[in-house]
A protein has these predicted regions:
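Alpha4 helix (beta4-alpha4-beta5 surface) of REC/receiver domains from two-component response regulators
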Residues: 72, 93-101
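Active-site residues of response regulator receiver
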Residues: 62-63, 90
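Acidic catalytic/metal-coordinating carboxylates
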Residues: 43-46, 69-72
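Conserved phosphotransfer cores of two-component systems
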Residues: 50-54, 76-84
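Short hydrophobic/Thr-rich beta-strand motif most characteristic of the beta2 strand and flanking loop
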Residues: 34-42, 50
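Non-catalytic signal-transmission and effector/linker regions of two-component phosphorelay proteins
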Residues: 1-11
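Conserved sequence signature across two-component system core domains
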Residues: 15-16, 41, 59
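Conserved active-site segment of CheY-like receiver
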Residues: 17, 89-93
Length: 101
């Protein structure tokens, strides 16, 4: 199964509570014609609200969001958008965090 049809860009939702990082990542991704950032969220609740409407192919998700770990957020995101793939982002070197991801 492919994530996006060859005639359209891969759609992305970027979820990270650090605005500067999130905006920088969006700017970087925007340079690739094969990618289209369709939305951004600063926390899991906002992402859960956006995903059913935006239906992104891929969700780029920070592992450490306010009030919820990324692994827990993935469960909720899969419920509202089972077709979306989730790519977790983290700067953590904690082996338990990495194993859970």
């Amino acid at each position: 199964m492919t994530l996006a049809a060859a005639d359209r860009p891969l759609t992305l939702l970027v979820v990270d509570d650090h605005t500067l990082f999130r905006r920088g990542l969006i700017a970087l991704l925007g340079q690739d014609a094969g990618l289209q950032v369709v939305g951004e969220a600063g926390d899991a609740a906002e992402a859960l609200h956006l995903v059913p409407r935006l239906r992104p192919d891929v969700i780029l998700l920070d592992n450490h969001l306010p009030g919820v770990m990324g692994v827990d957020a993935i469960r909720g995101l899969r419920e509202v958008s089972p077709h979306s793939r989730v790519l977790m982002l983290t700067v953590s070197e904690d082996s338990q965090d990495l194993a859970a991801a």
